[in-house]
Every structure is written in structure tokens, then in C-alpha cells.
């Protein structure tokens, strides 16, 4: 059961057992749709339809991307939020280039110039694999807290801070109707207690999972050229392979 596999569940008036059961039902329904349609990757619209009137799909995207649930391990299914098809396509490319590794999806939210960090939260979901980067999915799940989703329909978000380690971050963007690929080899780092506490305090009741990306590059250049509010990633360094795949596709 989901509640037994995660580190904790913070029930309140927004996150009830009934709401959580509904989110799990949505996850199982999404798995059925994927199987019925033989999909390789996907994107869920979620906001505002599901978040306002049903339930946020944070459980679905976290588990599908992570490749682990109550039935055990399965092939990770790259899936993005907010109907971001190009984000999902980027995730699929990173999965294939990395040999099948789980991929993640996040918002480019905040730049910490002093700390040389870029904050990468998500509106409520984070691929479960990155909660621990362990081959044992059960151990990763123990690093996740289910906290209230501050959305009209309530439900849970998968709160975690992704583990430190090498990352390849990428994004397919359209510029003047043509694709461009942005690729960064970097790493996630463990934030100091002060940085994490400040982030949590700033979020108030609206808590989100967040990765902290080391910005050992020209931050201003990144801000000027990066052409999206979303970014995708995979564990390891695959800049060369990603570049070669884009070149072979003619972009």
C-alpha cells in the first residue's frame, strides 16, 4: 500500500484518506490507459481541471516516472505535467539515451546567485527514484512525505528533496517554429539546512518537492537563453549522447 511505503503521510482537512484513495484510483486508471493505447511516454494536463474539480495527479506522475509501485518494479514511463508534450518528449529521449533510467520533470523557479544554485521545484510531483537514487524502489519511497496539495480539490503532493548526484538536464524548445535542444551537464546538491528551511518557510502551507541544481556555469547566459519554464533531467552525464541524437534527427 502507498501509505505503508512512504516515509509519512501528513493528513489534514485537505489531505484525507478519501482524497488519497481517489488519487491512487487515478493512478491505476492512468496505467490502464497507457497499456490500452500502447504509449511510450505522455503528458497530463492536470491544472486547472483536475486540481480544481477532481484531484491533482501528483501521485500518478511520481510513480510512473519512478518505475516502482505496490506491484514492484516496472519500466519507468516518462510523463510530464501541464500537458507539456515537448517536456515529455525530452524525458523520453533522456530515458533512451541513458539506457532506461527514470527521468524527472521540474519548474525552473528561482536563482540563488549567492549560493550558485537553481531551484527546481515541481507543482506537486517528483519522480520517486530521485528521492534516494537507489536500485531498491522501496528505499527511495521511504524518503517521500505525502503532504497536502494546496489546491481546491485537495489531495497529496510527493514532498522530497532529490538526492545529490550527477545530472543531465535538457529541454526541447521551439524557436521560430523549429526545435532547439538545451543541454546542461550538472549535479544536484544537498542544500544547507538554512537554505532548505528558508524555502519551506517561504512556501508556507503550499509545500512542493524541490531539487537544488548546482549552477557552475554562466547563470545570466542561462537565464537569457533558456526558453522554457520547465526542464527535464536524468541521472548521469549524457550531454554527448543527447547532442548526437539531436544531430541525427536533423535539429
Q: What kind of feature is each model-predicted range?
A:
Residues 2-251:
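Anaerobic metallocofactor- and corrinoid-dependent redox/one-carbon enzyme cores
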Amino acid at each position: 500500500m502507498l501509505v505503508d511505503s512512504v516515509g509519512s503521510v501528513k493528513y489534514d482537512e485537505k489531505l484525507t484518506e478519501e482524497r488519497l484513495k481517489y488519487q491512487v484510483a487515478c493512478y491505476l486508471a492512468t496505467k490502464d490507459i497507457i497499456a490500452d493505447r500502447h504509449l511510450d511516454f505522455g503528458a497530463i494536463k492536470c491544472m486547472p481541471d483536475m486540481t480544481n474539480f477532481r484531484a491533482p495527479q501528483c501521485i500518478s506522475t511520481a510513480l510512473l516516472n519512478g518505475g516502482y509501485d505496490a506491484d514492484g518494479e516496472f519500466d519507468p514511463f516518462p510523463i510530464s505535467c501541464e500537458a507539456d508534450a515537448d517536456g515529455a518528449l525530452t524525458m523520453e529521449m533522456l530515458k533512451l539515451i541513458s539506457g532506461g533510467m527514470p527521468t524527472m520533470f521540474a519548474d525552473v523557479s528561482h536563482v540563488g546567485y549567492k549560493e550558485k544554485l537553481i531551484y527546481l521545484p515541481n507543482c506537486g510531483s517528483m519522480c520517486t527514484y530521485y528521492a534516494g537514487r537507489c536500485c531498491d524502489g522501496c528505499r527511495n519511497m521511504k524518503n517521500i512525505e505525502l503532504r497536502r496539495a494546496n489546491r481546491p480539490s485537495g489531495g497529496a503532493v510527493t514532498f522530497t528533496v532529490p538526492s545529490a548526484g550527477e545530472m543531465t538536464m535538457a529541454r526541447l524548445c521551439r524557436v521560430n517554429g523549429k526545435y532547439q535542444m538545451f543541454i546542461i551537464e550538472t549535479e544536484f546538491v544537498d542544500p544547507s539546512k538554512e537554505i532548505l528551511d528558508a524555502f519551506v518557510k517561504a512556501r508556507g502551507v503550499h509545500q512542493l518537492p524541490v531539487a537544488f541544481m548546482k549552477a557552475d556555469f554562466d547563470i545570466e547566459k542561462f537565464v537569457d537563453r533558456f526558453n522554457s519554464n520547465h526542464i527535464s533531467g536524468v541521472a548521469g552525464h549524457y550531454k554527448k549522447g543527447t547532442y548526437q541524437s539531436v544531430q541525427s534527427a536533423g535539429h
